[in-house]
Amino acid sequence: MTQRKTDVEAYVLSRDLQGIASALSPFLGCVQLELDPEMQAHIWLSDQVRVIVQDSADCFVSVWVIGQFPWSSDIEFARLLASQLQCTVRCDPNAEHPQTGPCTFLEISAAQEQLIEWSEDQAV
């Protein structure tokens, strides 16, 4: 039996916090992100789930969901965000590509999905 993931994360090439909240709300309830200056992130909490949106490498923001959610993998979550936000999204590809290295990400855009090498010292 496969153990259910306790978190999913994707990196979104958008700083539209309202768009991110709107994309998640049908699945998690009314998501309202609020700035947490101590964590330098926008956070939303409910009884079942926590959403953390934080600046990441390049111009991407990390969208991290912890708790109970409907996605079975980071890839499924990233595909939803790419579709809803109409932007490029990156995620850990291990669910479908377990042989990849630590700097390999799946990049999802409207036109395609591809494996890329992405590290903190690379620009978009």
Task: List the predicted regions and their residue ranges.
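Short low-complexity stretches enriched in small and charged residues
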Residues: 16-22, 47, 72-74
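A broad, low-specificity signal for short, low-complexity segments enriched in glycine/proline
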Residues: 23-30, 50-52, 68
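An N-terminal amphipathic alpha-helical segment
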Residues: 36-61
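Short, extreme N-terminal segment that most often corresponds to the first beta-strand
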Residues: 1-25, 32
